[in-house]
């Protein structure tokens, strides 16, 4: 067997891609190893969404270069993902120790690229946008890694937000065939997977070809979620990341009529200022976003809302930032992710006037995060005394402790036997912190027996 080490940066889609890279390489005799030093092939699966993430990649490659030299050149280094797509030849120029560079739509070609590299012939670079070919070429079954799994259903983005590199690194929106998604999900369920998270850059833009036996028009995400909920063993369904422009009535209704859909919605808004939303090319207003949340909560009153925010976008005034703070107060988030604006080469926002100083961006980020932490702490504390169904995902740090996730995606720690792993159990919440809950085991839910 040959050793394979994969370092994954960035989003859940990259985590999924890394899992599929392992699937692609398994027939070639590659098996995962714990450290890069013991690997014959190291794959760095990269993120290009912010400058800091890109620089982490180059730092990692410097360390791998030294390991490769120490191994006498035995190690093969491959760079995959969005940095590979965006920088291509520049990446090879900056770090000649890299053997292979492949974009996120080309990892099904990795076996061929490895073969070419071993013979020192052919191109070291693959960055074509052939998403359909990629999904057709991937192994139809996957090896599950625990009771929860990601399933990619959509890739690419047609929205062209002015701050974002995704349309340039992931390509146009493309949805997988429903039959292929169902086959993959059934395979995972047969291995004990209880929860799936449907992935896409704009997952609620999903319009996948309908099942062959049913025909008709392309299916929406709401239709897909209802269908997947009928697969035996699949008891929980989530999806991420969604866009307000694609939050249609049927998907909102599915949150109310499909019990397997978890009461958790991650719907990024980025700003509460209409002026900044327009400059970002988001295609919606703050009030439109508020209306979506109102309708989702009407369909599923117990739903928890999550979001993403960018502070310090070019031209953002004090009034614009206050509009964001007011939106946060109005909505009340269970959790949210916030970042300083990071200029990305090649995006329209990078060429805009009015870039803010780091000190202003820092101050605004601190203020926003303080408010978001307060809301997250309050939401977690509101669970104390409640009994929640928890999907057990493994052992905790302490002896006799297990951990899992609540319907609201909170980490939950409780004492219990090891054989609960993979089951859904009832846990009474007795404590809460910013990032997790603690509880007492009540019973194993009937569906898990």
Swiss-Prot record:
Residues 143-378 form the Radical SAM core domain. The keyword Iron-sulfur applies. InterPro entries: Elp3/MiaA/NifB-like_rSAM (IPR006638), Methylthiotransferase (IPR005839), Methylthiotransferase_CS (IPR020612), Methylthiotransferase_N (IPR013848), Methylthiotransferase_N_sf (IPR038135), MiaB_methiolase (IPR006463), rSAM (IPR007197), rSAM_horseshoe (IPR023404). Its cofactor is [4Fe-4S] cluster. Binds 2 [4Fe-4S] clusters. One cluster is coordinated with 3 cysteines and an exchangeable S-adenosyl-L-methionine. Residues 381-443 form the TRAM domain. GO terms for molecular function: 4 iron, 4 sulfur cluster binding; metal ion binding; N6-isopentenyladenosine methylthiotransferase activity. One of its GO terms (cellular component) is cytosol. Signal peptide: none annotated. Its EC number is 2.8.4.3. [4Fe-4S] cluster 2 binds at residues 157, 161, 164. Belongs to the methylthiotransferase family. MiaB subfamily. Catalyzes the methylthiolation of N6-(dimethylallyl)adenosine (i(6)A), leading to the formation of 2-methylthio-N6-(dimethylallyl)adenosine (ms(2)i(6)A) at position 37 in tRNAs that read codons beginning with uridine. PANTHER family: CDK5 REGULATORY SUBUNIT-ASSOCIATED PROTEIN 1, MITOCHONDRIAL TRNA METHYLTHIOTRANSFERASE CDK5RAP1. Monomer. This is tRNA-2-methylthio-N(6)-dimethylallyladenosine synthase. The gene is miaB.
């Amino acid at each position: 067997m040959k050793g394979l080490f994969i370092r994954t940066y960035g989003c859940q889609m990259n985590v999924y891609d890394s899992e599929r890279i392992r699937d692609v390489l398994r027939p070639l005799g590659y098996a995962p190893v714990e450290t890069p030093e013991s690997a014959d092939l190291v794959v760095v699966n990269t993120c290009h969404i912010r400058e800091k993430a890109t620089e982490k990649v180059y730092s990692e490659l410097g360390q791998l270069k030294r390991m490769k030299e120490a191994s006498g050149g035995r190690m093969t280094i491959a760079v995959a993902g969005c940095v590979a797509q965006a920088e291509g030849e520049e990446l090879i120029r900056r770090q000649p120790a890299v053997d292979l560079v492949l974009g996120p739509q080309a990892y099904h070609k990795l076996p061929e690229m490895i073969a070419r590299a071993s013979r020192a012939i052919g191109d070291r670079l693959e960055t074509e946008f052939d998403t359909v070919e990629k999904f057709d070429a991937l192994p139809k079954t996957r090896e599950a890694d625990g009771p929860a799994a990601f399933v990619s259903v959509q890739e690419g983005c047609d929205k062209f937000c002015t701050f974002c590199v995704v349309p340039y690194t992931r390509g146009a929106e493309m949805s997988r065939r429903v039959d292929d998604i169902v086959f993959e999900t059934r395979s995972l369920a047969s291995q004990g997977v209880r929860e799936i998270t449907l992935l896409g850059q704009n997952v609620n833009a999903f319009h996948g070809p309908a099942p062959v036996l049913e025909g008709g028009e392309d299916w929406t995400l709401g239709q897909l979620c209802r269908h997947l909920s009928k697969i035996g063993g699949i008891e929980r369904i989530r999806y991420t990341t969604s866009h307000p422009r694609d939050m249609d009535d049927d998907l909102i209704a599915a949150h109310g009529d499909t019990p397997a859909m978890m009461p958790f919605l991650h719907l990024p808004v980025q700003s509460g200022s209409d002026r900044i939303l327009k400059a970002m090319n988001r295609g919606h207003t703050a009030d439109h976003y508020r209306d979506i949340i109102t309708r989702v909560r009407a369909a599923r009153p117990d739903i928890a809302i999550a979001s993403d925010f960018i502070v310090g976008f070019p031209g953002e005034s004090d009034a614009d930032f206050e509009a964001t703070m007011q939106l946060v107060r109005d909505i009340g988030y269970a959790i949210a992710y916030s970042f300083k604006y990071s200029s990305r080469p090649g995006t329209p926002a990078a060429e805009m006037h009015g870039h803010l100083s780091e000190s202003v961006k820092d101050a605004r980020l601190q203020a926003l995060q303080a408010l978001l932490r307060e809301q997250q702490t309050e939401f977690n504390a509101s669970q104390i005394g409640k009994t929640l169904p928890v999907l057990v995902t493994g052992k905790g740090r302490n002896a006799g402790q297990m951990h899992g996730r609540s319907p609201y995606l909170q980490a939950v720690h409780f004492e219990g036997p090891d054989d609960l792993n993979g089951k859904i159990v009832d846990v009474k919440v007795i404590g809460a912190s910013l990032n997790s809950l603690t509880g007492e085991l009540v019973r194993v839910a009937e569906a898990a027996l």
